[in-house]
Design a protein with these regions (language model features):
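Amphipathic alpha-helical segments within well-ordered protein domains
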Residues: 121-125, 200-204, 217, 231-235
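Active-site-proximal alpha-helical scaffolds that flank and shape metal-associated catalytic sites
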Residues: 153-221, 248-259
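C-terminal transmembrane helix end/exit motif
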Residues: 155-159, 230-237
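Terminal targeting/low-complexity segments that flank the catalytic cores of oxidoreductases
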Residues: 16-121, 125-134, 156-164, 168, ...
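Alpha-helical transition-metal enzyme core signature, strongest for iron centers
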Residues: 109-113, 117, 140-155, 185-199, ...
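Helix-loop elements that line ligand-binding/catalytic pockets
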Residues: 227-233, 250-253
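Active-site metal-coordination segments of metallo-dependent hydrolases
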Residues: 137
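Intrinsic disorder/low-complexity segments
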Residues: 1-24
Length: 325
């Protein structure tokens, strides 16, 4: 008898790929294709992308020194802002913390954008090039590739460690193989709204580093089209989703939002900067940080409530997670 999960324990290794493929097919049966999507809206965002897409290596002046003269995100978005420890830190320590936290957020964004690209390409394999969705999804994949290179370049120039998202392999496996398109669209919107809040604030803050402001501006403009597509998809297709897929999408939407916000600030940052051992606990219990988390999720929660993804049963769970007032 072969135990089904006895990997590396002296037992024969079973082939689990049919099992995984079966689960993936099951969720896809509960998904929908955007066949009723507005062609007019698709043409609008495709045309906008053709007219206004950005090459970060041409648009951004990377020669600006990555020193400690500017913050790398708005001060009030740094995890220790508003605490006694923050008050005791020098300006340079605060700036360095903002740099590491910005690069940690970039690493999380790259990780999630790669997962999204995988799901889009997986879907595109079966889509006709005559379908308008084919062109939009190709544009979105291309955008995400440029964004990942842009954020990777910023991490490299800041000369900080790569803050690899925690449990990334397990979460990536689940996302790639066990989520429906609807659930992935909800989680995509979660990532784009959360990072969009940070980017929008950074782009408008004159105290922030010029490169951070410019790459945030680029990301804000291009992600606005991605969010618009996700909004239209969910508005038109959520009513057609089966009961089981709805339940899974609701759960995954909350889970993915919590994971994304949780991953933004890697716990190793405080140790790497020589901050006191209690810094992590102080940041986690920071009331100001809790308010920022709610602000990050506010636009997402408003939309998901509008389309009934966050319903009366789901709302208390979002509040308990600290993502909803």
């Amino acid at each position: 008898m072969v135990l089904p999960f006895a990997f590396g324990c002296g037992f024969a290794r079973p082939n689990i790929f049919p099992f995984v493929e079966g689960l993936a097919a099951f969720w896809k049966l509960n998904a929908v294709v955007p066949e009723e999507f507005s062609d007019q809206y698709l043409e609008h965002i495709i045309d906008a992308s053709r007219r206004k897409s950005f090459d970060p290596y041409k648009e951004i002046d990377w020669s600006f020194p990555f020193d400690y003269s500017h913050f790398y995100m708005p001060q009030d978005m740094v995890s220790l802002y508003g605490t006694m420890l923050w008050d005791q830190m020098t300006r340079e320590q605060r700036v360095r913390l903002s740099m590491h936290e910005a690069c940690s957020a970039f690493a999380t964004t790259i990780w999630f954008e790669n997962q999204l690209s995988f799901k889009l390409i997986d879907y595109l394999i079966g889509v006709s090039p005559l379908d308008p969705h084919f062109y939009w999804m190709q544009i979105e994949v291309a955008d995400e590739c440029r964004h990942s290179m842009m954020f990777g370049e910023a991490i490299k120039r800041c000369e900080v460690p790569w803050y690899k998202p925690r449990f990334s392999s397990l979460i990536t496996f689940f996302t790639k193989y066990l989520t429906s398109r609807v659930a992935m669209m909800v989680s995509t919107l979660a990532a784009e709204d959360v990072t969009g809040y940070l980017n929008s604030r950074t782009a408008q803050d004159p105290e922030c580093h010029p490169v951070m402001r410019e790459l945030s501006r680029i990301h804000t403009i291009e992600e606005a089209r991605h969010r618009g597509y996700a909004h239209q998809y969910l508005k038109q297709n959520w009513p057609r989703v089966g009961k089981l897929a709805r339940s899974m999408a609701r759960r995954y939407g909350l889970l993915s939002t919590r994971i994304i916000i949780w991953q933004l600030v890697h716990p190793d940052i405080y140790k790497n900067l020589g901050l006191p051992p209690e810094a992590l606990e102080i940041a986690r219990n920071n009331p100001h940080r809790a308010r920022i988390r709610r602000e990050m999720a506010a636009e997402l929660v408003e939309f998901l409530t509008e389309v009934d993804i966050v319903d009366e049963k789901a709302a208390p769970k979002w509040r308990a997670a600290g993502l909803m007032a």
